């Protein structure tokens, strides 16, 4: 697949009409979704990569690409794949008619390597420093549009943000003692969240964080937020509300749950969806009135 040009923003007029109620403002910088689909999880079927497993009649990777393809505010999509399934993903992208997928690139051995490869490619493509980059695990197929919108909006105030879901369980921080783990501390539950994706950044921020991390051969982060937290500690990372349904499909045992979520999504009544959106708008308006 050949690389297509990334969208460049048009000059912003001096005066713009206010957006219609319930719509989101247009973006004046590129908003690039990086879909990470390069993993071959050891906890899944090694002969059947989970990104290509069908859930609800559609490959998992397509669910994730769909979410960004259908978001009007996302301008470009980069898909990072394992070379072993590159052909299959290219075929799917062509069959599904994704117009925002600019390039499909090979990932690295670890997640952090795949992100670094994508950032290098974006730099080569001339992406501006203030571009908004949303990095998403392909195996989180049910990310909601509200999480994507929230991530884009958060970058108007912060240079880094992550979707996260408030923990309903007490979280224990542990340390080793002999052959067992023991409790070291118990953080207050209201302050504990389960990290999800997308994790979003202004391009200059995440690029700088990765440049600093590259000098540390012992650093192996499990997500991109960790890179910013560890190497740019003065950069706050905003929390964007996630959802329990934004699960990460890690093992075969996750598939039945994913199928149930897919059935619920596919079976939603359009009238019920419209009613839910109206309730959300009313709740948002009420919240603004009480500020």
From Swiss-Prot:
The record marks 189, 248 as: Positions MEP for the nucleophilic attack. Pathway: Isoprenoid biosynthesis; isopentenyl diphosphate biosynthesis via DXP pathway; isopentenyl diphosphate from 1-deoxy-D-xylulose 5-phosphate: step 2/6. One of its GO terms (biological process) is isopentenyl diphosphate biosynthetic process, methylerythritol 4-phosphate pathway. The record marks 43, 50 as: Transition state stabilizer. Its EC number is 2.7.7.60. The keyword Nucleotidyltransferase applies. InterPro entries: IspD, IspD/TarI, IspD/TarI_cytidylyltransf_bact, ISPD_synthase_CS, Nucleotide-diphossugar_trans. It catalyses: 2-C-methyl-D-erythritol 4-phosphate + CTP + H(+) = 4-CDP-2-C-methyl-D-erythritol + diphosphate. The keyword Transferase applies. Belongs to the IspD/TarI cytidylyltransferase family. IspD subfamily. Catalyzes the formation of 4-diphosphocytidyl-2-C-methyl-D-erythritol from CTP and 2-C-methyl-D-erythritol 4-phosphate (MEP). This is 2-C-methyl-D-erythritol 4-phosphate cytidylyltransferase.
């Amino acid at each position: 697949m050949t690389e297509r040009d990334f969208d460049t923003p048009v000059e912003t007029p001096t005066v713009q009409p206010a957006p219609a109620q319930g719509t989101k403002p247009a973006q004046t910088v590129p908003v690039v979704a990086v879909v990470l689909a390069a993993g071959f999880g050891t906890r899944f079927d090694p002969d059947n990569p989970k990104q290509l497993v069908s859930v609800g009649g559609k490959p998992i990777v397509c669910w994730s690409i769909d979410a960004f393809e259908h978001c009007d505010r996302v301008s470009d999509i980069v898909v990072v794949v394992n070379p072993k399934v590159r052909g299959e993903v290219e075929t799917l992208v062509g069959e599904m008619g994704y117009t925002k997928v600019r390039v499909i690139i090979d990932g690295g051995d670890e997640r952090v390597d795949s992100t670094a490869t994508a950032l290098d490619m974006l730099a080569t493509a001339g992406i501006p420093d203030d571009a908004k980059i949303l990095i998403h695990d392909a195996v989180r197929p049910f990310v909601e549009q509200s999480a994507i919108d929230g991530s884009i909006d958060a970058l108007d105030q912060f240079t880094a943000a992550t979707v996260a879901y408030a923990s309903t369980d007490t979280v224990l921080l542990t340390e080793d003692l002999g052959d067992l783990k023991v409790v070291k501390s118990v953080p207050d539950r209201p302050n504990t969240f389960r990290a999800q994706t997308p994790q979003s950044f202004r391009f200059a921020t995440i690029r700088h964080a990765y440049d600093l991390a590259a000098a540390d051969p012992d650093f192996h982060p499990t997500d991109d937020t960790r890179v910013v937290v560890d190497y740019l500690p003065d950069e706050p990372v905003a929390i964007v509300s996630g959802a329990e349904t934004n699960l990460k499909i890690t093992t075969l045992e996750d598939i039945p749950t994913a199928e149930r979520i897919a059935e619920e999504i596919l079976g939603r009544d359009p009238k019920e969806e419209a009613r839910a959106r109206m309730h959300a708008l009313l709740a948002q308006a009420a919240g603004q009135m009480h500020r």
